[in-house]
A protein has these predicted regions:
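Hydrophobic anchor at the start of a short beta-strand
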Residues: 5, 77, 112-113
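A short, hydrophobic beta-strand element of the alpha/beta-hydrolase
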Residues: 30-33
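Gly/Ser-rich "nucleophile elbow"/oxyanion-hole loop immediately N-terminal to the catalytic nucleophile
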Residues: 1-11, 27
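Structural motif
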Residues: 10, 82-84, 119-120
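Glycine-rich nucleophile elbow surrounding the catalytic serine of serine-hydrolase chemistry
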Residues: 9-21
């Protein structure tokens, strides 16, 4: 038996991780790297998945999905954005909604949500910095 189930996703995998963490409360920690913004912050290559997003967004917003993915006892969601990513999901836009999602998560109950901006490179990948953060966070065993 596993103590926790954690999930890491990059790019479209981050989008998928956000959805799975929102609907499956067995996911303790979810790490989304360069793959999902609320629709109002997207630009260029950050296009939605037409059929899936249409169905999904008729029921909730991405901010709701982030709250659902981080809310609950022993649950945490961390979004990591590569500030200088040449592909997509760059900049510091995640910081614009971090406080609102974190506050809503705490208002409902336990859980945490945070955004990290990775300034160490300009590629669309999981950097050494992000990887070391994730491993350190998982090894904290604070649940």
């Amino acid at each position: 038996k596993f103590k926790t189930i954690d999930m890491i996703g990059l790019s479209a995998g981050a989008w998928l991780t956000s959805i799975i963490a929102a609907v499956d409360t067995r996911i303790s920690r979810s790490y989304l790297i360069s793959g999902v913004y609320p629709m109002y912050l997207r630009e260029g290559n950050e296009f939605p998945l037409p059929d899936v997003d249409k169905i999904l967004l008729s029921q909730s917003s991405y901010l709701d999905i982030f709250v659902m993915g981080s809310q609950g006892a022993d649950r945490r969601q961390v979004q990591i954005f590569n500030q200088f990513d040449r592909c997509c999901f760059r900049n510091k836009k995640g910081l614009l909604y971090e406080r609102a999602v974190s506050k809503r998560t705490q208002t409902i109950g336990e859980g945490s949500f945070s955004v990290i901006i990775d300034k160490t490179h300009a590629r669309h990948k999981i950097s050494r910095y992000a990887f070391e953060f994730i491993l350190s966070d998982i090894n904290r065993n604070d649940f």
